[in-house]
């Protein structure tokens, strides 16, 4: 009797929860390492005597490496497993994060940020493959929503931590410090993770049985799906629909994320510490909404686009109100409203991606979608830097660009059929074979 009670207590915490938590930490440190530069940027620009366009290129060059290696990184995870690829990648980018603090040359800093982006490019495909391996299909939307909270917490923590460290020790120290935790985390993943849930020493029969339904579905469709290749995936309209949705969405997201601190300092006249705090607020609000987006998309599975579309549109309207506000208090309010609905839409979107792509090419397929976002991440900060410089320091045109882009993302989402998961997925109810 006591043994049975102990077994029940132990079974409440599942291996997949640990996997998700560690994946969450990986995403968190990836965002911390890439986002501290947005707070440090005015000081880097002053130290290295950079124009707004040069600062924009410094923000964008990360995404050049990130986009370039996104698909190859996903393919590596499909071939070698997410454990090895993720552990090596996080150690790689953490080393180059710390090296950033030792650079005194602008060209060399561009090179470091580019190589840093190559390492981070391996994470998305590996992380989504890990979720596909360990989570039953009915929980993947929630899992991706929880994982995506780092899209909000990362910039929030980075803003506050970077402002505090820069204020006390200067901008170089923040990069040196941020690189250390990732190395430790990478070693943990290498020694403690398994690609196949069946190989994990703490995996229970009870938890494996929850995956059996997905496994059996995959076996029943094995013959039909055996010929599915990554090349054939490129012929699927749904891949390109999702890729273009994510491209336009990320034009807005990375413009909002990259230039918000500079906007608050240069246009609204806030201090460094106030900028850190107010830059963090939208992402703290978004932490709630991104989980809510994943949860709601699970509730309307098969019609996930109807969670994405209205929230993307509302976010664009909030950005318009933010642009038109003369009061700093209202600017802060509207930026929080914009972030809430932006991240709610984001949580719903990745539930659709994970549920739609064939399991055996999950990492490569999701990396392709994310690659388009990376291309947007390269274009957006650089273009906005040029627009700011060309307009004599005005941010008006950048807001118009962000509003237009997120509305276009919603319009593209309208072209997806209501039963997309059922009609387009080759095996949407499967988990990955390790």
For the regions a protein language model found, what residue spans apply to each?
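Cytoplasmic membrane-interface "Motif A"-like loop-to-helix N-cap segments
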Residues: 79-90, 298-312
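C-terminal transmembrane helical hairpin of 12-TM major facilitator-type secondary transporters
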Residues: 302-352
């Amino acid at each position: 009797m006591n043994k049975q009670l102990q077994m029940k207590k132990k079974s409440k915490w599942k291996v997949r929860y640990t996997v998700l938590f560690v994946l969450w930490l990986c995403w968190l440190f990836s965002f911390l390492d890439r986002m501290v530069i947005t707070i440090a940027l005015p000081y880097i620009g002053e130290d290295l005597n950079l124009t707004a366009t040069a600062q924009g290129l410094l923000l964008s060059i990360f995404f050049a490496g990130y986009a370039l290696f996104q698909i190859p990184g996903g393919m590596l995870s499909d071939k070698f497993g997410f454990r090895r690829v993720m552990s090596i990648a996080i150690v790689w980018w953490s080393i180059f994060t710390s090296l950033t603090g030792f650079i005194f040359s602008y060209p060399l800093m561009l090179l470091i940020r580019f190589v840093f982006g190559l390492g981070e490019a391996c994470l998305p495909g590996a992380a989504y493959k890990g979720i596909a391996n360990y989570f039953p299909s009915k929980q993947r939307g929630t899992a991706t929503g929880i994982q995506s909270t780092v899209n909000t917490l990362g910039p929030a923590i980075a803003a506050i931590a970077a402002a505090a460290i820069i204020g006390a020790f200067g901008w170089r120290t923040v990069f040196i410090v941020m690189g250390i935790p990732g190395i430790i985390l990478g070693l943990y993943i290498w020694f403690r993770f398994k690609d196949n849930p069946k190989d994990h020493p703490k995996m229970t029969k009870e938890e494996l049985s929850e995956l059996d339904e997905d496994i059996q579905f995959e076996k029943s469709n094995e013959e039909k799906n055996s010929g599915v290749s990554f090349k054939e995936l490129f012929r699927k309209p749904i891949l390109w629909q999702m890729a273009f949705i994510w491209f336009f969405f990320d034009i807005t997201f990375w413009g909002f994320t990259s230039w918000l601190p500079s906007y608050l300092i240069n246009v609204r006249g806030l201090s460094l510490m106030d900028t850190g705090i107010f830059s963090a607020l939208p992402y703290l609000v978004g932490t709630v909404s991104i989980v809510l987006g994943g949860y709601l998309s699970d509730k309307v599975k098969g019609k996930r686009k109807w969670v994405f579309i209205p929230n993307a549109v509302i976010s664009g309207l909030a950005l318009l109100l933010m642009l038109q506000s003369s009061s700093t208090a209202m600017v802060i309010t509207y930026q929080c409203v914009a972030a809430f609905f932006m991240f709610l839409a984001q949580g719903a979107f990745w539930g659709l991606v994970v549920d739609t792509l064939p399991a055996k090419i999950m990492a490569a397929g999701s990396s392709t979608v994310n690659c388009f976002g990376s291309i947007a991440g390269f274009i957006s900060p650089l273009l906005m830097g040029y627009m700011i410089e060309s307009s004599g320091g005005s941010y008006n045109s950048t807001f118009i660009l962000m509003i237009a882009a997120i509305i276009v993302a919603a319009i593209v989402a309208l072209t997806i059929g209501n039963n997309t998961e059922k009609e387009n997925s080759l095996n949407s109810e499967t988990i990955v074979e390790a």
